[in-house]
Curated annotation (Swiss-Prot):
Region listing for Activation domain, in residue ranges: 1237-1245
Superkingdom of the source species: Bacteria
Identification of the protein by name: TAL effector protein Brg11
Motif (Nuclear localization signal 1): 185-191
Practical application: By combining the DNA-binding domain with the catalytic domain of the restriction endonuclease FokI, TALE-nuclease (TALEN) enzymes able to target specific dsDNA sequences are created that enable eukaryotic genome modification. Other potential uses as transcriptional repressors, for transposon targeting, DNA methylation or histone tail modifictions are also possible.
Cellular component annotations (GO), alphabetically ordered: extracellular region; host cell nucleus
A Pfam family recorded for this sequence: TAL_effector
Residue ranges of the region described as Disordered: 1-87, 173-205, 1096-1138
Residue stretches of biased makeup (Pro residues): 67-87
Induction: Regulated by hrpB, which controls the type III secretion system.
Family: Belongs to the transcription activator-like effector (TALE) family. RipTAL/RTL subfamily.
Keyword Secreted belongs to the record: yes
Motif (Nuclear localization signal 4): 1145-1148
């Protein structure tokens, strides 16, 4: 067998062994020699065993030779031994046998060193040759005798194949080897022998010189620019390959990090070095990152080799795959999937399969992709037909996972059984279970365990069982729930069934349950002091087990110096996929990112880390923040943080850096704010790529979208898929029978899950427009224009007739109102489940109240909270009435708000808070749970002498801006500096603000009135009458707390956080993204910046002369207000003041006059866009135009005869132009200045 031959993995391994041998020990003879007889695939193993290769043999410094018999001694008169010269020919018939005596574990090689053969110079040369080979293997030394074994049967000396391949042994057998013998270069000096010398004692192989060889390779890699950390992580067998191909790969543009990643599959180094030019020519869009991701896989070299001849065909018809799609298949499906994709490409895209390229790629991009593609070809026609009736999308979802072929077969075998009694699953549930890795086993587990888990003592619902099984490892999770549920529900754990299900309903659910069982008691005790809810939140994600263990190990350190994180912050970081790694990233990066040149706040760092992939996002911010803040990018710190604070934040930052300059130039002409808005969502990287490839096409015929519309579609989770869906569906949806306008299509697509919502509208539109549903186009668009719109439409189709009939008797508008929110499907199901119970004793709610609670984001959870807490809150010590409870629950976040009132009301009514029940209810209704928590945390400090705020002012601040406002005041909002600058630079003659503005109590009353009103359309008119106010005065009051005119007229009060952001914008300050409130340093820096800016000459005149000067909007897409449900709870229980002192000075003399005036300015047909037609009474199917409003300083921008199309964002949602005007001149002297001064007076401490 030849050494150094380059064909085949076997001989490459031999040559790689020589790469580790330094020149003094490298054998001289490397010429090609003919292959010896019997040199087969096992010769490599024989050779390694012959030289002492043993996988698990420990390295030792020295070996003590065992006792052995003495060798014959040559007579003294014998002539001196000659140098290495060929001996007389040995017998030709040398069997190639690997004797056990040469194996690493044989002791016979030591104790019986073949005394039948006298030692010869050839044998000693053989020993030195074998010793050199042993050095090259980097393996522990094994004693080897200097004499070969003897075949007792033939009397011949035995040589194995490894010995036969040696040039020394070959020299002893010239008949057996064609090449002439060559003496090797000796690795050690030999002393001159005298005539009386005997042959030296038998030689044992010494320990390989691995330290010397390691130093040589290490030094070479260091010289090539690799860091010590990179070298430490490399595999030993890859070192020489890296050194060999480094120059070639770096010349092709690969970095040191790229080469290290490729070396995980060392064979890929050679393939990439040799074939990169051909790959780049065949796939010009294939990036080096794609190649690295493919090459580092288990068989990446084979995938690259398979890709090269078929790449051009895959980019052509019928698939027309992009380079990234081909790379995805090669990375995950490897060579078999690439070959199957090429072979089946026409069959998959033609009749009867008609798969799209995206579907084909999804199927092929998994382990077992080849088998899945073949199975789809066979099974898809069958599963689409009766009796299965699966859609193509469902079949693709099942096949697009590891084990997709087996999952398809399992669905075919079990679907009909699971749809029937006693299981009664629906098709979607079966598909959900099967659409994960291990789907076959999960289906079998559901079939085996569902009936047991639905019965006593488990009492799980079908939905809960399906949720547990619908993840990777679903079978094991079901088994764990069955084994541990009863124990976890009992003492000392005391978990609820819902909490156990939440923990188990993720990848690795079984391990997460075991971790909760092991660590819950410790984490609830000292010194951790976590609540049960916090432990459950940490465990309820992929990798929950590891996250719990990391919290237990690091919580105490992170709460102490120098990190100083709160327990809530640590929990927030850990409560995501990859929470363990995110905590490690915080420990490594927090101190660095808080110092120069980064200057991030702790809250910003926590916000970045509190997402899936948080560790990588932190590292990316550390690497790129400084560059992105500098020219030519010129991003602000807040924008960088906003981009990084999402799933895939690292990739989004890299995409912004790569594409920002291009997207700001022609032909895209996007603003920096628009690019940031697109990137600041989950999947921002893909969304930016989609905008770059589709913007120009979508702006042209036949789509004719505006740039703002394209940005609006892309600025959500799944923006890439939504853009693709608009490109595919827009033309069809604008035509008959759908007849949607472009704005309606954009509204549907501009939500999370927009792609699926568009597809659902196209599929369900004809059915829902016809009897018995008879929904209008506007109602369908309203349902679909929310996250989860597809599921909401399907739920309406499934539950509509039941909810319209007794005992529910809901109107069509009420059903649509419930479905037209986040989680509309779940809200409809909750109404069906809880309606009769809530209408009966002891609850006694009206139908309108049940609908009002369900008609908000999170309606299901709010209904469940009312079911659990209403009896408790009506009893002592709470003593709330039903109307107050319904008012709190009838808003987004109703469940946590109710729970916060239940937990904190007794505390907040006592010292040192001294709040009334009405104030607590108002804060919970207006600003929610977080505001109550902020008051509990900060009010004792705000009541002290350093702030001296009364309870009424604290309550007003909480209603104005929620938690953010309370924390900003607590940290030191620079109100005095702002007011002083305003007095110096923009003096206004007139009465002081205290004589013009309402009291804090009156402000809270007005906001609560709007939030608790049953008919938002009528709220403004009723407020004019209730508070005896003029229209301009009420508008100015609402404007002073961040409500735009159009929102006020529609009765839509945005949530406190959004209003606070607007108010800070009017003051000229934008808090850092991701932070709960501005930090003291940033606030003081803001005040100093204001003083420097306004201290310049001419600023006062500029302010006075241009009170309405607009500044550019921050983004083309205004933040959408939280849309109010049309069915809100009843009036507040506390008596409202008949009139307010500040309004009394401006009130009309006759209440009827007020009614007439308001009727003219706010007509009965004022609609809130998609929400208008959902009011239970007095609603039309189609909205009409808004009549001309009174002309007044506060309403001039509210033009006449403005028609709002159905299915668009609410007219209660201000446009970017509205917000720009609202925040136009922070320090002007316009009509709102008095009320801005009044706001500053309330905030001043």
């Amino acid at each position: 067998m030849r050494i150094g031959k380059s064909s085949g993995w076997l001989n490459e391994s031999v040559s790689l062994e020589y790469e580790h041998v330094s020149p003094p020990t490298r054998p001289r003879d490397t010429r090609r020699r003919p292959r010896a007889a019997g040199d087969g695939g096992l010769a490599h193993l024989h050779r390694r065993l012959a030289v002492g290769y043993a996988e698990d043999t420990p390295r030792t410094e020295a070996r003590s030779p065992a006792p052995r018999r003495p060798l014959p001694v040559a007579p003294a008169s014998a002539p001196p031994a000659p140098s290495l010269v060929p001996e007389p020919p040995m017998p030709v018939s040398l069997p190639a046998v690997s004797s056990p005596r040469f194996s690493a574990g044989s002791s016979a090689a030591i104790t019986d060193p073949f005394p039948s053969l006298p030692p010869t110079p050839v044998l000693y040369a053989m020993a030195r040759e074998l010793e050199a080979l042993s050095d090259a293997t980097w393996q522990p030394a094994v004693p080897l005798p200097a004499e070969p074994p003897t075949d007792a049967r033939r009397g011949n000396t035995v040589f194995d194949e490894a010995s036969a391949s040696s040039p020394v042994i070959a020299s002893a057998c010239p008949q057996a080897f064609a090449s002439p013998p060559r003496a090797p270069r000796s690795a050690r000096a030999r002393r001159a022998r005298t005539g009386g010398d005997a042959w030296p004692a038998p030689t044992f192989l010494s320990r390989p010189s691995s330290s010397r060889i390691g130093r040589d390779v290490f030094g070479k890699l260091v010289a090539l620019g690799y860091s010590r950390e990179q070298i430490r992580k490399l595999k030993q067998e890859s070192l020489s390959e890296i050194a060999k191909y480094h120059t070639t790969l770096t010349g092709q543009g690969f970095t040191h990090a790229d080469i290290c990643r490729i070396s995980r599959r060392r064979q890929s180094l050679r393939v990439v070095a040799r074939n990169y030019p051909e790959l780049a020519a065949a796939l010009p869009e294939l990036t080096r990152a794609h190649i690295v991701d493919i090459a580092r896989q288990r068989s990446g070299d084979l995938a690259l080799q398979a890709l090269l001849p078929v790449a051009t065909a895959l980019t052509a018809a019928p698939l027309r795959l992009s380079a990234s799609q081909i790379a995805t298949v090669a990375q995950y499906g490897e060579r078999p999937a690439i070959q199957a994709l090429y072979r089946l490409r026409r069959k998959l895209t033609r009749a009867p399969l008609h798969l799209t390229p995206q579907q084909v790629v999804a199927i092929a991009s998994n382990t077992g992709g080849k088998r899945a593609l073949e199975a789809v070809c066979v099974q898809l026609p069958v599963l689409r037909a009766a009796p299965y009736r699966l859609s193509t999308e469902q079949v693709v979802a099942i096949a697009s996972n590891k084990g997709g072929k087996q999952a398809l077969e399992a669905v075919k075998a079990h679907l009909l059984d699971l749809l029937g009694a006693p299981y009664v699953l629906d098709t979607e549930q079966v598909v959900a279970i099967a659409s994960h890795n291990g789907g076959k086993q999960a289906l079998e587990a559901v079939k085996a365990d569902l009936l047991d888990l639905r019965g006593a003592p488990y009492a799980l619902s079908t939905e809960q069982v399906v949720a547990i099984a619908s993840h990777n490892g679903g079978k094991q999770a079901l088994e764990a729930v069955k084994a541990d549920l009863l124990e976890l529900r009992g003492a000392p754990y005391a978990l609820s069934t819902e909490q156990v299900v939440a923990i188990a309903s993720h990848n690795g659910g079984k391990q997460a349950l075991e971790a909760v069982k092991a660590h819950l008691l410790d984490l609830r005790g000292v010194p951790y002091a976590l609540s049960t809810e916090q432990v459950v939140a940490i465990a309820s994600h992929n990798g929950g087990k590891q996250a719990l263990e990391a919290v237990k190990a690091q919580l105490l350190d992170l709460r102490g110096a120098p990190y100083a994180l709160s327990t809530a912050q640590v929990v927030a970081i850990a409560s995501n996929g990859g929470g363990k790694q995110a905590l490690e990233g915080i420990g490594e990066q927090l101190l660095k990112l808080r110092t120069a040149p980064y200057g991030l706040s702790t809250e910003q760092v926590v916000a970045i880390a509190s997402h899936d992939g948080g560790k990588q996002a932190l590292e990316a911010v550390g690497a790129q923040l400084v560059a992105l803040r500098a020219a030519p990018y010129a991003l602000s710190t807040e924008q960088v943080v906003a981009i990084a604070s999402n799933k895939g934040g690292k990739q989004a930052l890299e995409a912004v850096k790569a594409q920002l300059l291009e997207l700001r130039g022609a032909p895209y002409a996007l603003s920096t704010a628009q690019v940031v808005a697109i990137a600041s969502h989950d999947g921002g990287n893909q969304a930016l790529e989609a905008v770059g490839t589709q913007l120009v096409a979508l702006r042209a015929a036949p789509y004719a979208l505006s740039t703002e519309q394209v940005v609006a579609i892309a600025s959500h989770d799944g923006g890439k898929q939504a853009l693709e869906a608009v490109g595919a569906q827009l033309v069809a949806l604008r035509a008959a029978p759908y007849a949607l306008n472009t704005e309606q299509v954009v509204a549907i697509a501009s939500s999370h899950g927009g792609k699926q919502a568009l597809e659902a509208v196209r599929a369900l539109f004809p059915d829902l427009r016809a009897a018995p549903y008879a929904l209008s186009t506007a109602q369908l668009v309203a349902i679909a224009s929310n996250p989860g719109g597809k599921q909401a439409l399907e739920a309406v189709r499934a539950l509509f007739r039941e909810l319209r009939a007794a005992p529910y008797a809901l109107s069509t508008e009420q059903v649509v109102a419930i479905a037209s929110n986040h989680g509309g499907k779940q809200a409809l199901e909750a109404v069906r489940a809880l309606f009769r119970g809530l209408r009966a004793a002891p609850y006694g709610l009206s139908t309108a109240q049940v609908v009002a609670i369900a008609s908000s984001n999170g309606g299901k959870q709010a209904l469940e909270a009312v079911w659990a807490l209403l009896p408790v809150l009506r009893a002592t010590p709470y003593d709330l009435n039903t109307a107050q409870i319904v008012a709190i629950a009838s808003h987004d976040g109703g469940k946590p708000a109710l729970e916060a009132v239940w937990a904190k009301l007794p505390v907040l009514r006592g010292a040192p808070y001294a709040l009334s029940t009405a104030q607590v209810v108002a804060i919970a209704c207006i600003s929610g749970q977080q505001a109550l928590e902020a008051i509990e945390a900060h009010m004792p400090t705000l009541r002290q002498a350093s702030h001296s705020l009364s309870p009424e002012r604290v309550a007003a601040i909480a209603c104005i801006g929620g938690r953010s406002a309370v924390e900003a005041v607590r940290q030191g909002l620079p109100v005095k500096a702002i007011r002083r600058i305003r007095r110096e630079k923009a003096p206004v003659a007139g009465p002081p603000p205290a004589s013009l503005g309402p009291t804090p109590q009156e402000l809270v009353a007005v906001l609560h009135f709007f939030r608790a009103h049953q008919q938002p359309r009528q709220a403004f008119v009723d407020a004019l009458a209730a508070f005896q106010a003029t229209r301009p005065a009420l508008l100015r009051l609402l404007s002073s707390v961040g409500v735009t005119e159009i929102e006020a007229l529609g009765g839509t009060i945005p949530d406190a956080t959004e209003r606070w952001q607007r108010l800070l914008g009017r003051l000229g300050f934008r808090p850092a993204t991701g932070a709960a409130a501005p930090s003291p340093d940033s606030l003081q820096g803001f005040a100093q910046s204001l003083e420097r800016t306004l201290g310049s000459p001419g600023m006062a005149g500029q302010s006075a002369c241009s009170p309405h000067r607009k500044r550019p909007a921050e983004t083309a897409i205004a933040p959408r207000s939280i849309r109010r449900s049309p069915n809100n709870a009843g009036q507040p229980s506390e008596p409202w003041p008949d009139q307010l002192a500040w309004l009394q000075r401006r009130k009309r003399t006759a209440r009827s006059h007020i009614r007439a005036d308001s009727a003219a300015s706010v007509p009965a047909n004022l609609h809130l866009g998609t929400r208008a037609q959902f009011t239970p009474d007095r609603l039309r199917a189609e909205p009409g135009p808004i009549m001309q409003a009174h002309t007044s300083p506060a309403s001039v921008s509210f033009g006449s005869h403005v028609a709002f199309e159905p299915g668009l964002p609410d007219p209660g949602t201000p446009t970017s132009a509205d917000l720009a005007s609202f925040e136009a001149e922070p320090f002007g002297v316009g009509p709102l200045d008095f009320h801005l001064d009044w706001l500053l007076q309330i905030l001043e401490t």
